[in-house]
């Protein structure tokens, strides 16, 4: 029987059926607070347990009695319930209740199966503590992204009864029961995109309708799924176990592949007779017709069942920690689930985005992590300290958290990532320091044996947006990290109390508070205070390993539904514990910590920490070769066989493929958390994380490629910076999400090679590709916006302003432009510099670029900005800049733009600053002098530093003078030394020139130095130089460089030196005047010689004959000598000039034929017009004959 009930725009559809194999319990009256009551013909009702609720709310440890959970008794009838729910914008959930820390019965907006009745809806301890990480964010505007959920059902013959899952994803499409029973129309303008779903074997669409508005719908949906999922009794039948592939013969007669769950039959997912293609002609969304329903329909999400959050091991009693879920049949030993681990648990295949198919395999164990204290059996499933009660539930937990957080964080830069951000906290993160040793895995490993479930799930360590945090944080947080050391040392001894001091924040998640929250003024919260004690214990364990402090993202605040910032950790469900930051550069670790890490690895008797020796204490976290563990039964002493974060195998044999980017299509093993076994992570953690390494993956499966397909051997950065960088500059970039095709350029097995891999144009280059949103697309004000396919254009402008460090950010104040140094744009520049270059901050001040001085100094426009500001800056501003550049002064000195900043300090800086920079130059004078840009700094320094420092600087060149003189850069330094330094200090240069004057004078650079010596050195220093010059005057005047030295002597030399040179020229005026270089010397001789010497030279030209013509005629036609004649006309005495004129007049007509003769005629006309002298007609007869 099918009934449709519509209450307040909420359409609820259910169907009662009979499941004879389940126990019957009396029905209880419905809770009037529930909007819709769904009753089943059968069903096991949980007994009321208010005490458990209140115990949890008080933060105490309690253990509900068997039967209070209603796990095994979960009615199969609820499997056939499909909900179509639509909440209006701004509509809030039901009022608060008294139990479960705010979780009351009226909170569930949909019928929740058997436990919808008030008496039976006792939220179990694990549900309250771990309702899917951040599900308490429903008060926020979660955006138009659904978070579909589903649950695992038993694998028995009852699967033929009909659909068994509760699928919330396809809210706007075809009814799961057919249009005849209940039809919900598809909203207008919702684009259908086949092949976008994340299912391996089904052609399902994943359309997120804009009508899904921003009321937190997805959160409550998943919350419902979590609250009504079956317990361990169902899972004991093997949620991942084998099934009969023919059991779905009623499912349209269409047999699906087993998918990647290898025989995991989760129940028929379509009702018999249901037509796959409805009015919209598309398959029912969210895989209603697929067997494998344990993954999300939206990118980046996956379903998890409620029992995945069981806190303690099956054999652990409630007194050792928080209350655990106990099935009605008793705890099931771990061995019952060993068969589950033999299959891989891949995530839903993503759409093609230009890489080879990278499978998202997670198995049912914790993900390997890197830690120096890896000797503790953290994930020993044979011990009492299990983190989760059931391995298969743990697998689902990993699928959920790892896919949503680690993958989403890794992928988020691309606008074509279809990630559902609803489960994440977007901006409300306060960056602070966790004290030394509080790395969740360092401290957790050390304290695991006594803290029980204190171990932080792996999503804590998710590779948080790679490099989106200022590198300076590592230094800035050192003080805070050290400050917490004393208190932690005092708390390391009471080990017996650790089991009772495990406190979870407000029942939000399984992850304990970390000490960084103690530094944020939150001790007023009793839960926080208790967590402080617990975290201090773990902190003390980390101290033993010598681990330094780690910067973490502390979700110390969140935005409520009104957009107000609420800073109160623990008061809100779902605000996850701090996320450890991964440095944009190699991880900074002290030498003592490095030694301690090596020692810890060496001290491991069973080799548990063997994989840490090469990974923890160095800047690299290399990828090892994957070695799958074939045996299904783990060994207690080998749980941490490879604890590397990018380790070369899983923590134990239960986890054969716990990889974020596993190799191959559906390979169950040979993967690690980091990336595929054949993928290179790059040289260092910081430099390569952005691009997923130099090679993303060498997958074994082929995929369609495109012009920029990111194959295993391709360059990740082939696209120009003007286009949206493929993954690459998620390289330090922030995270932002959109549901455009596929995550991080990964091709999906379910999509053909022809699937579009082009990112949407709306978020290219500078859009949301640079924003940091741990929770998805926000509009810059903490509000979610739609991440549905096609919604990018709607929020194009909003997403572009959602950068963590942008002025419109909700995390940092816009009064100080707090950009992270690692928030690198596709151009490679920081966001601040990029905005400055684009004139977005025309009134930027020096103080506003604090922390970016080095970057600005090395940029063309940034360097110019600093130079201009330094000229008019106050001493305090200059000191601000100086403090940042001093340590890296040498780097700037040799930089093409940075050297100008250093020069400005020599020019405008204080004496102390000049001396400090001069001290940085000491010892590097020669290298800087020979460097293109460093030589400029040396020259500027020589101009402005005191003489004592000048002398010290110059002395470093002693012995290298000739090398510098002949160098294109060094010669400028030597010239500046000669110009600025006292000549007495330069005698070593004069001595070095002895015997080398001719060679240096004919050298392109040496000739300049010779001239500087002649200008500035003392007479007794220049005499030996001049003597050598006079010996080679004839050769020098004809040399392309030597002629400049002779001209310099004629211009600036003593009269006796000039006379010596003129004497060398006399008798050779005609010949030398026709020489390209010597003609310049003759000109200088005519100009600078004495009157007598000048008359002699002019007379020589007038009286000498060159064959049939006079020498003057020859010179007037010559391309070089004509300039000598012109100079003679200019400088000759009046009487001698008249003689020259008369000598030229007979050749006037002929000179008109020659290019250079015309210069002479022009000179004559100018002269005669000026003086009014009439020499007759200048123009001769037409035939040219006189």
Swiss-Prot record:
Keywords: Acetylation, Cytoplasm, Differentiation, Methylation, Phosphoprotein, Repeat, RNA-binding, Spermatogenesis, Translation regulation
Transmembrane portions of the chain: none
Residues bearing PTM Phosphothreonine: 112, 514
Composition bias type Polar residues, residue spans: 511-524
Predominant cellular place of this UniProt entry's protein: cytoplasm
Residue ranges of Pumilio repeats: 848-883, 884-919, 920-955, 956-991, 992-1027, 1028-1063, 1064-1099, 1103-1142
GO CC, alphabetical: cytoplasm; cytosol; P-body
Residue ranges constituting the PUM-HD domain according to the UniProt record: 828-1168
Region of interest (Uracil-nucleotide binding in RNA target), ranges: 899-903, 1043-1047, 1122-1126
Basic and acidic residues: bias regions: 250-272
Cellular localization per UniProt: Cytoplasm; Cytoplasm, P-body; Cytoplasmic granule
Residue numbers carrying Omega-N-methylarginine: 796
GO MF, any single term: mRNA 3'-UTR binding
Positions of the UniProt region annotated as Adenine-nucleotide binding in RNA target: 863-867, 935-939, 1007-1011
Pfam families per the UniProt record, alphabetical: PUF (PF00806)
CDD domains listed in its UniProt record: Pumilio
Guanine-nucleotide binding in RNA target: annotated segments: 1079-1083, 1080-1083
Residue span of region Disordered: 22-73, 233-272, 485-524, 613-648, 742-775
Low complexity compositional bias, start-end: 45-58, 485-502, 626-639, 763-775
Post-translational modification: Phosphorylation at Ser-714 promotes RNA-binding activity. Following growth factor stimulation phosphorylated at Ser-714, promoting binding to the 3'-UTR of CDKN1B/p27 mRNA.
GO biological process: adult locomotory behavior; miRNA processing; mRNA destabilization; positive regulation of miRNA-mediated gene silencing; post-transcriptional gene silencing; post-transcriptional regulation of gene expression; regulation of cell cycle; regulation of chromosome segregation
Positions of region (Non-specific-nucleotide binding in RNA target): 971-975
Record comment regarding domains: The pumilio repeats mediate the association with RNA by packing together to form a right-handed superhelix that approximates a half donut. RNA-binding occurs on the concave side of the surface. PUM1 is composed of 8 pumilio repeats of 36 residues; each repeat binds a single nucleotide in its RNA target. Residues at positions 12 and 16 of the pumilio repeat bind each RNA base via hydrogen bonding or van der Waals contacts with the Watson-Crick edge, while the amino acid at position 13 makes a stacking interaction.
PANTHER family (UniProt xref): PUMILIO HOMOLOG 1, RNA BINDING PROTEIN PUMILIO-RELATED
Function: Sequence-specific RNA-binding protein that acts as a post-transcriptional repressor by binding the 3'-UTR of mRNA targets. Binds to an RNA consensus sequence, the Pumilio Response Element (PRE), 5'-UGUANAUA-3', that is related to the Nanos Response Element (NRE). Mediates post-transcriptional repression of transcripts via different mechanisms: acts via direct recruitment of the CCR4-POP2-NOT deadenylase leading to translational inhibition and mRNA degradation. Also mediates deadenylation-independent repression by promoting accessibility of miRNAs.
UniProt name for this protein: Pumilio homolog 1
Primary gene name: PUM1
